[in-house]
Regions:
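Catalytic cores of soluble, metal-dependent hydrolases
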Residues: 2-94, 103-106, 113, 185, ...
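Active-site flanking residues adjacent to catalytic metal/cofactor-binding acidic residues
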Residues: 7, 98, 126-128, 178, ...
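Active-site histidine-anchored catalytic micro-motif
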Residues: 88-162, 265
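Residue-level recognition of the N-termini of beta-strands and the immediately preceding loop/turn
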Residues: 120-122, 173, 225, 268-269
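Short, structured patches in soluble enzyme cores that scaffold and shape functional sites
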Residues: 125-128, 153, 177-182, 199-201, ...
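Short secondary-structure boundary/capping segments
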Residues: 141, 166-168, 187
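Phosphate/diphosphate-binding glycine-rich loops and adjacent basic-rich segments that engage nucleotide
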Residues: 155, 161-181
């Protein structure tokens, strides 16, 4: 079995400022998870941190294209290099973000590998939002984190969507989206593109186990796939510490079953976790719950002979089930 190699990609370049005098806090996400012992309890190799460029949206205005595109592009190349190096060492890269724009670097890495082997590599996109805004369906683009799926499927400005001339990083037919809400504004665009999507109600109706089987069937023609997990796929009642919380999400046990079923396949080449924002988690409770959930979901990857450092590594901590569901949409402060 492959050993997990954890490295941080704490880029917040793909989000707009939450206020006029602050920067997105998701750059602190990897540190919060490390503080909860994630790396040690996975018996993973600590592969360090890939430091992003400075966050500086400057005087960006609607119509200027994607904000901080040059910095995101440069960082994506470095991230792709790091992901490829990790896979080439026979390890499973677990990338701790950071915002969803890190999918550009992961996508570039997968496209390089696919072209080198003349094979197809897919993308499993577990996310509360489709991230499918692009110039063809919106009046303007701006925050790359809200456009990540569009960019990696070739819809976007060349400095992001065609790095090294490799547009697209994933074919539409090789992408499966899980966890979007029924009211997602780009569902019709996904359908028109032929991108398969499994909204939360359908996921619930099928169950996580059957949903994983369905995902694998959709990607049967691919030699492997990359797994993207945006923690805003969770309902805000259990995970409000994100830039754009949206009611109607899944629960932790469902997330654990999805991750476990997807990473247990030898075809899963790596995984990224995005958008957890400790600025909205003042007492650290959500960092703790997320860590426990990731440990449980990643348990199939624990290497024989390297047991988890804690007996609780594969067992989620008890969570409150009495919290009332959040029914009022929260403001999407980061990805607009």
């Amino acid at each position: 079995m492959r050993r997990i190699a954890v490295f941080d990609a704490p880029s917040n370049l793909g989000l707009r400022p939450p206020t006029a005098t602050s920067v997105p806090g998701c750059a602190k996400g990897p540190g919060a998870l490390r503080d909860r012992g994630l790396v040690e309890r996975l018996s993973a190799r600590d592969a360090g941190c890939l430091t992003p460029p400075r966050y500086d949206p400057g005087d960006w205005r609607p119509g200027d294209g994607v904000a901080q595109a040059s910095a995101i592009s440069l960082y994506s190349v470095r991230l792709a290099d790091r992901i490829e190096e990790t896979i080439d060492e026979g390890e499973f890269p677990l990338v701790l973000g950071g915002d969803c724009s890190i999918i550009i670097g992961a996508g570039l890495a997968m496209r390089r590998r696919a072209q080198a082997s003349d094979e197809r590599i897919g993308l499993v996109y577990v996310d509360g939002h489709s991230d499918f805004r692009h110039q063809g369906n919106a009046s303007y683009v701006g925050a790359a984190a809200g456009e990540g799926l569009a960019i990696v499927t070739g819809r976007g400005q060349p400095d992001l969507a065609a790095i090294e001339g490799r547009r697209p990083y994933f074919r539409d037919a090789d992408v499966v989206l899980i966890g979007i809400r029924t009211h997602d504004g780009y569902r019709m665009d996904l359908e028109a593109a032929g991108i398969q999507a499994l909204p939360v109600p359908k996921l619930r109706a099928e169950g996580a186990g059957r949903s994983v089987q369905w995902v694998r069937a959709q990607l049967a023609g691919c030699s492997g796939y990359w797994l993207h997990v945006d923690v805003d796929v969770l309902d805000p009642a259990v995970m409000p510490a994100v830039d754009a919380p949206d009611p109607g999400g899944i629960a932790y046990p469902e997330l654990e079953l999805l991750i476990g079923g997807l990473v247990s396949s030898p075809g899963c080449l790596g995984m990224q976790v995005t958008v957890f924002d400790p600025d909205y988690d003042l007492d650290g409770a959500h960092a703790g719950a997320l860590t426990e959930s990731l440990l449980a979901g990643l348990h199939p990857l624990l290497v024989s002979g390297h047991p988890p450092a804690s007996a609780t590594a594969a067992t989620p901590a008890a969570r409150r089930t009495s919290d009332p569901p959040i029914t009022t949409p929260q403001p999407a402060v980061g990805t607009v």
